[in-house]
């Protein structure tokens, strides 16, 4: 999934194709960008994906060079996510996002600038769906809080957590 420091002009120039039930950008053969608001069925498991987040340092960056406004998820992407989740009865095995829902963000940081629209959208998804585990990045730490795992340097298999 995308984060908040991607070159979205480049990322969005790749062809959109269908893969495992959802939409992806094919960056190279075998290298896929799992697009926002998609449900993928992989090896008998369902994954919901929703990338993006606001950059807290964007005032130091230059638009189109080191910062892109497309880092912030749109209402259309949110609506597509809801539509796709409804098709799966709001039930998935795993969620993969860049940032996290508000209640998780509050446990990880006291920085209110991290409470961006993506966080709010994820909180709405969180209220509607059932899932086994939620994986996210953005906070540059490896930690598990209940069934939410922040990943930075660790790599874990689905259903894995940080000890």
Describe the function of each predicted region.
Residues 1-41, 110-111, 115-122, 127-128, ...:
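Core catalytic region of metal-dependent phosphoesterases/phosphodiesterases
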Residues 14-18, 55, 62-63, 148:
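Amphipathic, positively biased hydrophobic alpha-helical segments used for protein targeting
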Residues 22-29, 38, 42-112:
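Active-site-proximal loop/helix segment associated with metal-binding centers of metalloenzymes
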Residues 47, 135-163:
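C-terminal capping/extension of enzyme domains
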Residues 4-10, 40, 55-58, 101-105, ...:
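Active-site environment of divalent metal-dependent phosphoester hydrolases
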Residues 1-2, 33-34, 47-54, 95-100, ...:
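Long, contiguous hydrophobic alpha-helical segments, chiefly transmembrane helices and signal peptides
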Residues 16, 43-45, 90-91, 130, ...:
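Short glycine/proline-enriched coil/turn segments at helix->beta-strand junctions
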